[in-house]
Design a protein with these regions (language model features):
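Active-site beta->alpha loop and helix N-cap motifs at the rims of alpha/beta catalytic domains
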Residues: 1-13
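Short secondary-structure capping/turn micro-motifs that flank functional sites
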Residues: 10, 32-34, 201-202, 215
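Catalytic alpha/beta core domains of metabolic enzymes, predominantly
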Residues: 14, 22-156
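Phosphate/pyrophosphate-binding loops and the adjoining catalytic core of nucleotide-dependent enzymes
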Residues: 17
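Flexible, acidic glycine-rich loops studded with aromatic residues
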Residues: 117-222
Length: 229
């Protein structure tokens, strides 16, 4: 899959790639508003591909949410002043994203595409190991179970879940509680729009730094090879 960040500039790229039958991993998905644009770009891309006579059956895509980063940032901002709100925002955000996912991929618009073999764009839960040792080591895997989803657990988390994790379709439960949590976070001075914007900026910087480092290494290697010729 080609990685495309969930940014305003990335949205038309997602549609264009899907429209050409190219599989896409939409990465750095944090904001529910941007996620709405991501789903629309995917579905519109499938329509474009079908209109051009392409094979929509062969197209796959995921929208990757980085889970633990949300709680790490919010917990640091809360500074133990609201212990009842800590370690909950990431799961709440994922539950609301999954609700929106189900709404769009059971819509008449998508169902018409699915009759021709279109696949849903699956939510992918990344960074699902707990960073706070006070939290259960299977907190995120247990809370993020739902149909048509992917969880990229690190080996230690996978082994822990295999040993003592509990399986239930947890993503679709307690949606009202998830919505209420964001109200309570706002009352505590934490706004999800600010949180998701900061996380996206951090993620993009990591990608840019990694890319620049790779290009620098390639350039260095090229110069060494030229000296040997």
């Amino acid at each position: 899959m080609v990685k495309v960040p969930a940014t305003p500039a990335g949205i038309p790229a997602i549609r264009a790639l899907i429209g050409k039958g190219i599989n896409v991993n939409v990465t750095l998905t944090f904001s529910l508003d941007i996620y709405s644009d991501v789903r629309k770009a995917y579905i519109d891309g499938l329509e474009d591909l079908k209109k051009d006579g392409g094979n929509i059956k062969s197209v796959s895509s995921v929208a990757s949410f980085f889970i633990s980063r949300v709680d790490t940032l919010i917990d640091d901002a809360l500074e133990d002043n609201h212990p009842d709100l800590m370690g909950k925002a990431a799961i709440a955000n994922a539950k609301l994203a999954y609700r929106d996912f189900n709404n769009d991929f059971t819509s008449d618009k998508f169902l018409r595409l699915s009759q021709h073999g279109a696949r849903v764009q699956r939510p992918l839960w990344a960074s699902t190991s707990t960073k706070n040792p006070q939290y259960s080591d299977v907190l995120y895997p247990e809370s993020l179970i739902g149909r048509d989803t992917v969880n990229t657990m690190p080996e230690s988390t996978l082994l822990a879940f295999n040993e003592h994790g509990k399986v239930s379709e947890s993503l679709g439960s307690n949606i009202d509680d998830a919505t209420q949590l964001f109200v309570e976070l706002q009352e505590a001075g934490i706004y999800m729009k600010d949180v998701t914007s900061e996380l996206l900026a951090q993620g993009l910087k990591l990608f840019i730094d990694s890319y620049d480092s790779l290009i620098s290494d390639i350039e260095h290697k090229r110069k060494l090879l030229e000296l040997r010729i």
